[in-house]
Amino acid sequence: MQGSRGQGELFSNALQAGSALTESLPLQQQQLLEWQRRLHAHQAPLFRREPLQSEQTDLFGAGGADPADAIDPLALTPLALNFWRWPESPHSGAAVYLVLDRPAELDQPLLLYVGETMAADRRWKGEHDCKAYLAAYGEALQQCALKPRLSIRFCTDVPQATRARRALEQRLIQRWLPPFNKETRQRWATPFTAES
């Protein structure tokens, strides 16, 4: 059965050729803009403080206020992503942090990542998954002749207890669906990756 062996090699070569082709295809500006528009369609009503269609009114008031509703990303002070290099950090202690971009083509920003920390002044020193995604995102924007306008914002009015703070982080992720959080990455079919 020498024929089946040859077919296997032929099939294997075809797969390798196909993967080389997809690696060499550049990201088009229109693809990136469309990706931003899809994310914006979900997040813009939240930035405008409009209720989500999926949120239903609690007729009996038993649910209580969701602490995630109280966090308005635009009310928080924007900082450069390299804030951690400054001689003195503007924040310390427990915090929830939000990474945003402000595309010129859209009427609202994009919330790209939500995180939590017990040490706001030290969290971004060293390795962080989000840094790699932001670098890939910034590079993709530049290759498409678009300008990134990234910022990070800290909310320090959060629970000190790690479990409660992580629960708040998860509520924010479920609400905003930021594309760089692992919980929601697949939803947005991100057209760029941090892998080389």
Predicted regions: what is each one?
Residues 89, 119-166:
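Conserved short loop/helix modules at catalytic or binding sites
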Residues 80-83, 128, 184:
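Solvent-exposed, flexible loop/coil residues
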Residues 97-99, 152, 172:
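Generic structural hydrophobic/aromatic packing signal, biased to beta-strands
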Residues 1-118, 162-167, 190-196:
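GIY-YIG nuclease catalytic motif and its immediate N-terminal context
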Residues 155-196:
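Structure-specific nucleic-acid interaction/processing domains
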Residues 19, 43, 132-133, 141, ...:
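Amphipathic alpha-helical interaction segments
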